[in-house]
Amino acid sequence: MVGGGAGSFIGPVHRMAAELDREIEMVAGAFRRDPAKYLAAGAAWGLPPERSYADWREMIAAEAARPDGAQFIAITTPNHLHLPIAREALAAGLHVLCDKPATATLAEAVELRDCVKASGRLYGLTHTYTGYPMVREAREIVRRGDLGALRKVVVEYSQGWLAEPIERSGDHKQATWRADPAEQGEGGCIGDIGVHSFNIVEFVSGLQVSRVCADLSSVVPGRRLDDDCNVLLRFDGGARGVLIASQIAAGDRNGLRLRVYGEKGGLDWSHEQPDRLTINWLKAPTQ
């Protein structure tokens, strides 16, 4: 694993998910930006000193050369490092699992696509919400044609944790790098949670977005990246959609909600009740 040391939000999530079925074992890591703390970080994860690395480049080279080396790496760093780490790992013959977004810019995404094709290795991107059973059931309902031809898709992802400029406090690591264009990339809220919204829309509907009209705003004064996003969508086939992503929705925690409407009815799923899927039929009782 690259990243995921003390203070990381997503690193421990990757670790727990990897160990659920006992088929994956973390054998090496470069967990900290501070080289002086890398051994302690590795020890906290139960790694021997020789498999804890001060630098991700050193780790990739060493693990690729070992007969018992890592088979793939998980990238849990800020966004600006996603491409360089993935590029070097793929070139060294390692498979890659990366936290979203894949890259910080569109140009980097194109380069990553070419790197993956040339390497012959697998590349996975962790859009976690598509793993919920009810999200997969929603996709199957749409695929069967139960709703009829799709007409409209609405997705909303609201958080309130950035309603204040906490990135300036100096003691909120997660907010600090997400508000820094040099580390987060060109998109703030849209790159952090808007990508989840976009992913679940295409995953469930089976449609592809063909055009967008986007209003990206920085609501908190002085913030350098967008923290509120309102996007009109057009899909192939003519369906319409709306994507709302906000991190200044004061009081909201992690409110991802998806609604899909067809000729015969619509379905409604919310992350706050992930085991519940509601189908509202035009000419039949709600299920």
List each model region and its residues.
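Contiguous beta-strand/loop segments that form the cofactor/metal-binding neighborhood of enzyme cores
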Residues: 164, 173, 192, 196-285
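Redox-cofactor binding/interface segments in oxidoreductases and associated redox assembly factors
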Residues: 31, 74-75, 98, 155
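Predominantly a Rossmann-like dinucleotide-binding segment in NAD(P)-dependent oxidoreductases
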Residues: 122, 129-223, 277
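Short, Asp-centered acidic motifs that coordinate Mg2+ and/or phosphate
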Residues: 28, 72, 152
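Beta-strand-loop-alpha-helix segment that lines the small-molecule cofactor/substrate pocket
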Residues: 72, 78-131, 145
